[in-house]
């Protein structure tokens, strides 16, 4: 009897312990620390970043930027800020008006667009290229050990402490140990480093001239006569530098501890030579001349620690440590690395560039259609304040957006595609005609409002939401033959179906319905009447087009849309690769090509999901967006499986196609498909040690993939409005005990 009683007590205690563990708060410190990146060799794709979201410093295996030439074609060693921009002198006096062209389109016979003039006239084409390339993001300066060789560096042991925002690097230089700790001030554009070594290595500070190229590390080292570096203040442990790069002027403050000598070794080169084995230094970058000395090393380090501790303690988090599926630890690692990457490079006052603050692509300018992937996740991970910082920039861009709509004959404001802090539209033969960025402002505003609802917030952004929707309402055309509203005269989101031939692109149709619905809801919250015209559009907006076998098409019409008559049956669960994708290995092929049999090519050549360049926009219509009258559940189920089976994952995908598929599958309660979508082993979504997505030799970093992952995984955990399933994106097979805190559901 006593034995049975004892056994009962033990079992009860165990049950209570399990219950207590289930309710115990996530150990956030342990979660972050077990996923810290670790580097043991010099590899141009293994660089790591410290940053505060508005300024970032990317370092090589030495903890500084010692080998920029070696890393040039990998994750290059950049020092970038949100304010650092440069324009080449406009010697030909190009005018914006020279980039504009009357471009009649179906449904919109009168419209003036900013284009590139590929067929001339030559001056217009050159004007368009000048405005595309200017302004471009400026590399502020390279900071690295002076005159070291890659071959001299051995025994590398480097760890990024993401909890503190500290990069710890240890290596041997000619058999002498060197230890470096690197950090970035949490509030200011200051990089700090402490160095411990009997080698007493000097630090070189070099300033490049910009290249103006669309995609590179923005460093030209052979144009010293085009810019200048002047020491305007020199004190025993501090110096102030004025940088003049054409019309761009900025300032650099260098401060250090102990005995060291700062010397100018070239027109745009400095060297800081220490006398002590242990010392530290700080390099701060300023848009305007600083009037007080910058913080010292200790203060900068504490600022970095505070910034990152506060972030990790208040952000949403997901803990996969209780899962037994072998994919769980890999997925957790990718999530945590993405959180760090985006907070360190994309917590800006402007929309981010596609490669963040790592290196320049598209001249360092930002693409407004990508804001959805870069930044929407903040509102779902308990960081709506970071999303609102970017929303505030949109308010400054309203006048430019209103001018665009007016010259094209539309009401309201039309958001540009590619731009910079000035909000000037970059001319483009594609970007000027896309529209899927248009409802983003409405969605952003709604996500922030849901996170912290208030009448004050509604009033602040109501006019921008209203005017954004006004353009949307004026852009649709009424098709009297079929008593419906249609979208035409726009380039589809995939940029494969052009503005001349595309009719009713799937994602844009669903997004128009969602955006106008939310805009009406905002009017009601403010005590205003609904727009009758908008309600009519909502009631008569054309449903998504389908193939004869009931698969949603990317668009109803468009040049290049395949014939679906011989579609592949969609009954079985798709066979997709599922395995480790975090291997840190350099891709073997640069072109992403795949080998298919002739039979496979023949079978798939007419399938829309196997057309390189398409972007799964029919899946975006239900995943990123909630259910609407435009969506039929049965057809979307078939579309999901068809996409999962036949998408050209090895040659036609972007890093955000995977979360697109995952979100669609999650809403359709297909968790295994959702999970496979974000864990498949595919080189175009290769995860580097830093957490960056390697997509191609041009896009060695692609941060929309990281933001998309966070969007998808948050939905897989927290679901959406009206979802009653716990962790709806994870299989209920006992292997996925996913715990999370601080996440918010999708609409």
For each predicted feature, which ranges?
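Bacterial N-terminal signal peptides
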Residues: 9-19
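Catalytic cores of secreted or luminal carbohydrate-active enzymes
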Residues: 120-152, 704-745
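Acidic/His metal-coordination segments adjacent to aromatic residues that form catalytic metal sites
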Residues: 350-364, 415-433, 488-505, 603, ...
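Active-site core of glycosidic bond-cleaving carbohydrate-active enzymes
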Residues: 65, 70, 88, 367-400, ...
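Acidic/polar, glycine-enriched structural segments that form the non-catalytic walls/loops
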Residues: 23-365, 384, 394-402, 583, ...
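A conserved hydrophobic secondary-structure block that centers on an alpha-helix together
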Residues: 173-181, 185-190, 447, 451-467, ...
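Acidic/histidine-rich catalytic neighborhood
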Residues: 467, 471-525
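Bacterial N-terminal signal peptides that target proteins for export
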Residues: 1-8
């Amino acid at each position: 009897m006593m034995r049975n009683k004892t056994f009962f007590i033990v079992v009860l205690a165990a049950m209570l312990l399990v219950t207590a563990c289930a309710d115990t708060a996530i150990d956030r410190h342990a979660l972050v620390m077990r996923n810290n990146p670790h580097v043991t060799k010099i590899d141009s794709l293994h660089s790591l970043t410290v940053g505060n979201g508005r300024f970032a410093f990317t370092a090589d295996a030495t903890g500084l930027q010692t080998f920029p030439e070696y890393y040039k074609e990998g994750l290059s060693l950049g020092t970038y800020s949100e304010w650092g921009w440069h324009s080449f002198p406009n010697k030909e006096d190009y005018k914006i008006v020279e980039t504009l062209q009357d471009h009649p389109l179906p449904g919109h016979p009168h419209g003036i667009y900013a284009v590139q003039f590929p067929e001339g006239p030559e001056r217009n084409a050159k004007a368009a290229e000048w405005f595309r390339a200017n302004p471009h993001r400026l590399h502020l300066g390279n900071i690295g050990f002076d005159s070291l060789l890659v071959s001299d560096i051995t025994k590398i042991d480097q760890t990024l402490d993401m909890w503190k925002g500290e990069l710890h690097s240890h290596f041997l230089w000619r058999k002498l140990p060197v230890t470096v700790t690197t950090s970035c001030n949490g509030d200011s554009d200051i990089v700090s480093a402490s160095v411990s070594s009997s080698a007493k290595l000097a630090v070189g500070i070099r300033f490049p001239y910009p290249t103006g190229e669309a995609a590179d590390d923005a460093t030209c080292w052979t144009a010293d006569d085009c810019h200048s570096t002047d020491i305007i203040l020199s004190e025993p442990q501090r110096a102030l530098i004025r940088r003049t790069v054409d019309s761009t002027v900025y300032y650099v403050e260098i401060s250090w501890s102990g005995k060291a000598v700062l010397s100018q070794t070239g027109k745009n080169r400095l060297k800081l030579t220490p006398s002590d084995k242990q010392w530290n230094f700080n390099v701060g970058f300023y848009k305007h001349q600083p009037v007080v000395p910058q913080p010292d090393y200790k203060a900068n380090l504490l600022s970095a620690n505070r910034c990152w501790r506060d972030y990790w303690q208040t952000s949403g988090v997901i803990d996969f440590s209780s899962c037994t599926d072998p994919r769980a630890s890999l997925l957790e690692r990718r999530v945590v690395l993405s959180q760090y990457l985006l907070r360190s490079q994309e917590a800006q006052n402007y929309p981010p560039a596609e490669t963040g603050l790592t290196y320049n692509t598209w001249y360092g300018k930002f693409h407004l259609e990508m804001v959805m992937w870069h930044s929407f996740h903040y509102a779902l991970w308990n960081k709506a304040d970071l999303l609102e910082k970017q929303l505030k920039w949109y308010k400054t861009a309203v006048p430019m957006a209103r001018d665009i709509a007016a010259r094209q004959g539309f009401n309201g404001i039309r958001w540009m595609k590619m731009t910079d802090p000035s909000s000037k539209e970059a001319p483009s033969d594609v970007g000027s005609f896309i529209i899927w960025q248009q409802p983003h402002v409405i969605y952003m505003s709604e996500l922030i409002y849901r996170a912290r609802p208030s009448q004050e917030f509604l009033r602040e952004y109501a006019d921008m939401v209203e005017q954004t929707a006004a353009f949307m309402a004026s852009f649709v055309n009424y098709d009297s033959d079929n008593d419906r509203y249609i979208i035409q005269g726009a380039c589809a989101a995939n940029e494969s179906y052009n503005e001349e031939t595309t009719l009713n692109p799937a994602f844009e149709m669903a997004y128009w319905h969602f955006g106008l619905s939310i805009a009406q809801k905002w009017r009601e919250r403010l005590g205003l009447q609904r727009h009758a015209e908008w309600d009519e559009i909502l009631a008569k907006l054309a449903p998504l087009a389908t193939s004869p076998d009931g698969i949603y098409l990317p668009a109803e019409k468009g040049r290049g849309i395949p014939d679906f008559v011989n579609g592949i049956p969609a009954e079985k669960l798709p066979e997709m690769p599922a395995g480790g994708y975090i291997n840190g290995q350099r891709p073997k092929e640069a072109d992403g090509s795949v080998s298919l049999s002739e039979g496979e090519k023949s079978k798939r050549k007419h399938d829309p999901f196997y057309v390189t360049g398409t972007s799964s926009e029919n899946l975006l219509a239900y995943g990123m967006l909630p259910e609407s009258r435009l969506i039929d559940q049965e057809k979307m189920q078939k579309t999901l499986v068809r996409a999962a089976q036949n998408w050209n994952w090895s040659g036609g995908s972007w890093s955000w196609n995977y979360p697109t598929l995952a979100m669609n599958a999650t809403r359709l309660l297909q968790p295994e498909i959702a999970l496979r979508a974000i864990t498949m082993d595919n080189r175009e979504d290769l995860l580097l040690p830093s957490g960056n997505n390697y997509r191609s030799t041009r896009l060695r970093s692609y941060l929309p993939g990281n933001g998309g992952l966070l969007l998808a995984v948050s939905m897989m955990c927290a679901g959406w409005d009206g979802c009653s399933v716990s962790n709806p994106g994870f299989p209920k097979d006992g292997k996925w005990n996913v715990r999370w805190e601080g996440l918010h559901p999708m609409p």
